[in-house]
Amino acid sequence: MSAIDKYAVKQFLMSLQDSICQQLEQEDGKAVFVEDAWHREPGERLGGGGRSRVLRDGLVFEQGGVNFSHVEGKEMPASATAHRPELAGRRFEAMGVSLVIHPKNPYVPTSHANVRFFIAEKEGEEPIWWFGGGFDLTPFYPFEEDCQSWHDTAKAICAPFGEDVYAEHKAWCDKYFFLPHRNETRGVGGLFFDDLNHWEFDKCFDYIKAVGEGYCQAYLPIVSRRKDIEYGEREREFQLYRRGRYVEFNLVYDRGTLFGLQSGGRTESILMSMPPLARWEYRYEPEAGTPEAELYERYLKPREW
């Protein structure tokens, strides 16, 4: 069994945050990420700290957040131990990079990515550890070409790790990013995985490296293709309406958000994924035969790519 090196994981995550921020700034051409470094004082429920980076009012990106955090605690919150009683009584560390990018142009999809590592330790016992993460795409005016290239990149990332990895993690993504009260997916999916520890540590670590580094490879070509398409008030209004679904999912269903808030995490960083503007409209129905209707009919349900 390969040795568990949580320090190497932390170094990778911090360098990944740097790399993603640099690539997004280059694509935007104007805005830069502003860093808010934070740490927890001794005696708080959670120790540790992180680097929250936010970009606002760019040429391409209306708002984006790329967050690194490394927190530790003496015991798990009840929300976690209810599902995993073996974690009770163990000190834990959780570290990861999480990001959400909200573009200006409605023809450029919103995107999200996350890679994370968790370890719970108790003296005299083997550590309990796992990796999680993935990336997913939320278009407002989808292009078949973009959705296909997004999933083709995901397939290429997964291929070296096993012939079933893409299919499993793609299906998991479709299931996870689903809004039951709306009976629709949040977007066109991608990859999602959690509790990844059935391979050797080194192989699991290599996989999250590939996913983390693959995010920009998948997303930035789509941004480049769509960022200069002309749009008007109608497209902007629909973009804001669909952003409301993002808010609904994150506040009602997202496990990371719920875990962070319940465990005493840093609220500003946890809610960094929220769009700067969103809107709701009572009983909205897209007009038949419109691009807005096509989103509902063809893209907000699981499909094979």
Swiss-Prot record:
Q: Which UniProt keywords apply?
A: Cytoplasm, Heme biosynthesis, Metal-binding, Oxidoreductase, Porphyrin biosynthesis
Region Important for dimerization, as annotated, extends over 246-281
One Gene Ontology term of the biological-process aspect is: protoporphyrinogen IX biosynthetic process
Subcellular location(s) of the protein = Cytoplasm
Chain residues that bind a divalent metal cation: H102, H112, H151, H181
Instruction: Give yes or no: UniProt keyword Transport.
Output: no
Q: Where does substrate bind?
A: S98, N114, V115, R116, G264, G265, R266
User: EC number(s) for this protein?
Assistant: 1.3.3.3
- Co-factor(s): a divalent metal cation
Molecular function GO terms recorded: coproporphyrinogen oxidase activity; metal ion binding; protein homodimerization activity
Q: What is its main location?
A: cytoplasm
The family database entries (InterPro entries) matched by this protein are listed as: Coprogen_oxidase_aer, Coprogen_oxidase_aer_sf, Coprogen_oxidase_CS
Its Gene Ontology cellular component terms are: cytoplasm
Kindly report, in one word, the top-level EC class recorded for this enzyme. oxidoreductase
Catalytic residue positions = H112 (proton donor)
Pathway assignment: Porphyrin-containing compound metabolism; protoporphyrin-IX biosynthesis; protoporphyrinogen-IX from coproporphyrinogen-III (O2 route): step 1/1
Catalytic activity as recorded in UniProt? coproporphyrinogen III + O2 + 2 H(+) = protoporphyrinogen IX + 2 CO2 + 2 H2O
* UniProt site positions, description: Important for dimerization: H181
What does the subunit comment say?
A: Homodimer.
Q: Tell me its family.
A: Belongs to the aerobic coproporphyrinogen-III oxidase family.
State the function annotated in the UniProt record.
Answer: Involved in the heme biosynthesis. Catalyzes the aerobic oxidative decarboxylation of propionate groups of rings A and B of coproporphyrinogen-III to yield the vinyl groups in protoporphyrinogen-IX.
Q: What is this protein called?
A: Oxygen-dependent coproporphyrinogen-III oxidase
Encoding gene per record: hemF
